[in-house]
Amino acid sequence: MDMEFGMGKQLTWTLVFVGLWLGVSPKVMPGMEYGIIVDGKLTQHGAIVGRSTRAGDGIDDQAFVLKGLYKFVYAGAGFRSSNARIHARISLNQLGNTGAGVLVNGHWFTFDIGPSNQIGAAGPVFGKTTKVFAEAEGRIQPDTPFDVDIVIQDGFLTYAINGETVGEVKNFPSAMETVPSKDVGSVHKLGLITALRSWRADLKIYDFRVETDGEIIPLPETKTIYQSGSARTNTYRIPALLASKQGTLLAFAEARRNSGSDTADIDTVVRRSEDGGKTWSDEITVFDEQDNVAGNPCPVVDQSTGRIWSLQTWNSHQVHENQTKVGFGKDSRRVFITYSDDDGKNWAKAKDITASAKEEHWSWYATGPGAGIQLQRGKHKGRLIIPCDHKSLPEGGPQTYHSHILFSDDHGETWHIGAQTGHGLNECEAVELENGDVMLNSRNHGVDEFYRGVSISKDGGQTFSSFRRDPKLLEPRCQASIRRYRWADNHQPGVLLFSNPARKWRDFLMLRASYDDGKTWPDARVIYPYTTAYSDIVVFPDGRIGILFERDNHTKIDLAILPSWSPVSESD
């Protein structure tokens, strides 16, 4: 695991988070100082992503050293109040557009932008251009420690180098300001998140701390399941998470062997855990077609037989998405299926089912990503459902993008094309509603919209109503996951869970809850507030919740395991 936490009081912070989860608020401690790196040492409150060395390793006896792209040291918590002071004492081994800087609420405050080495900032407040504040020359020198102070008070931010104010920003946003929901539970609202990154520099960190007048909200701890750059795999992407009938956790992913591209030598792989996520097996290959694309895993378990099915898609590594042809030829996208009867240890030879799973005028095609479902109620109880998407290229007509469903009524032996949505939707997941309807929640594609698309089927996924945009589910045009946590009974409401990067850009992975079958989403938790993308949810047999998610620019796929769900209203 490449993410490291400071040691010492992890248990205390974990218990605080569980308290928050159950709706118990910790005491507010005004003026609290939160030390992330103190005297060159990572504290129990900080975490790193990527390579680092510690004070005393011979590189520097007094500093924590962070090196390279996609390497961060961040606060292992969020802060309720946005009124805060961020302080860092650091040095860079070089200047020259290194990209090193301080992250504050989705904005980067950097030290040497461009060839002229200017101090500046970038992020939503500044639009598509970088804001230049001052010249680095005379203020920052290579291998010379300097002090950075960022102070936010009632939305007014000041940026100082060595005590000199170099920049000011009015109306600076809090961390969660862009979540468009007035009824979200208070436990997830964050005023501030922060991190340091090295990028193209060797960043020596002598001190990194936050002073805040509000409460500190620890983030859930995570475990890395797939680390990009490990073994023989350049990049792992596209997670799917499933619990077998026996309770085994199966974490699927694409293993992109020689590059991070969507078109490469890609295999579908899985790792297994028989102890609730504590330990994991080695990687098992599910589907490998030489050096071609064999990915987009969409697994589903048949609860009546215990068989685990995995559907995925294939294309030649020489054919990019925009080059895929309609039909079923060698230049087209094809659908394959495999299964396991021993809880995911071994997998049958994959079978091509394209003829029954794809229409002639479809070109691009993707299963999932994420797990499928088995219907539990109504006329179609037992039906297996696989969410998919495709691009349609009808002869003489415009190309359009749609979500659709594959279904099986004979325990996975045969598959049929079911409901299709209207144009403008893409990757999707399905969930069964209390009345047996099937709801499809879809990513937007090809339209200027940043809200999830929602479609309803009243016949088990064979036809859809026209879809609607859900203004409570903001998205950056990215895959998301939706799952049923529990059914309603006489004592408690049913619960749906939804996870995605909850802004217009790919960060702030949130887990939300609905108690009215997706009409509203009044409760939410922050899972990971930094760079993130695809995710998948699973509900453990004991009621705990697992979220498998991409993070840190696809450098890893992590698993967060959370306690059983208790709405704020139940625990007040």
Show which residues each predicted segment covers.
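Extracellular carbohydrate-recognition regions
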Residues: V28-A55, I217-P218
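Asp-box/BNR beta-propeller blade signature and adjacent active/binding-site loops
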Residues: E215-D572
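Extracellular beta-strand elements of beta-rich domains used
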Residues: L203-V210, L562
